[in-house]
Amino acid sequence: MIYLDEFTGMEVSIVDSPNRSEIGRTGLVSFETKNTLEIDTGRKRIMIPKHLRKFRINGQFVDGDLINMRPEDRLREYRRILRDLRR
């Protein structure tokens, strides 16, 4: 399940965002914090908040609000993530 993985090194694309200029941006995740993903686009690195965004990571769609936590905390929050996915 991709929601439990650490995203560093994975290919990411922004599918939906309140900021329309972010939609369609693609690259590799170079760093991940609790609230942001740092994406290396090839030309520069951009910081994208996870909140209110939808991503496609390695071909799978991911809701940014469900991954809005530290990577190591996602394993502890496994049951909450599964419950929210069922909604």
Curated annotation (Swiss-Prot):
Asked if Hydrolase is a keyword of the record, the answer is yes
- EC number(s) of the enzyme? 3.1.26.5
Please give the Gene3D superfamilies that the UniProt record associates with this protein: Ribonuclease P/MRP, subunit p29
State the top-level EC class: hydrolase
Query: What keywords sit in the KW lines?
Result: Cytoplasm, Endonuclease, Hydrolase, Nuclease, tRNA processing
Name the Gene Ontology biological process terms: tRNA 5'-leader removal
Subcellular location, principal: cytoplasm
Q: Which GO terms describe its molecular function?
A: ribonuclease P activity; RNA binding
Q: Name one GO cellular component term.
A: cytoplasm
Fetch the SMART domains from UniProt: POP4
Where is this protein localized, as stated in its record? Answer: Cytoplasm
InterPro entries, sorted: RNase_P/MRP_Rpp29_sf, RNP1, Rof/RNase_P-like, Rpp29/RNP1
Task performed by this protein: Part of ribonuclease P, a protein complex that generates mature tRNA molecules by cleaving their 5'-ends.
NCBIfam families in the cross-refs: RNaseP1Mthb
The entry sums up its family as follows: Belongs to the eukaryotic/archaeal RNase P protein component 1 family.
Protein name per the record: Ribonuclease P protein component 1
Source organism of the structure: Thermoplasma acidophilum (strain ATCC 25905 / DSM 1728 / JCM 9062 / NBRC 15155 / AMRC-C165)
Point out the gene that encodes the protein. Answer: rnp1
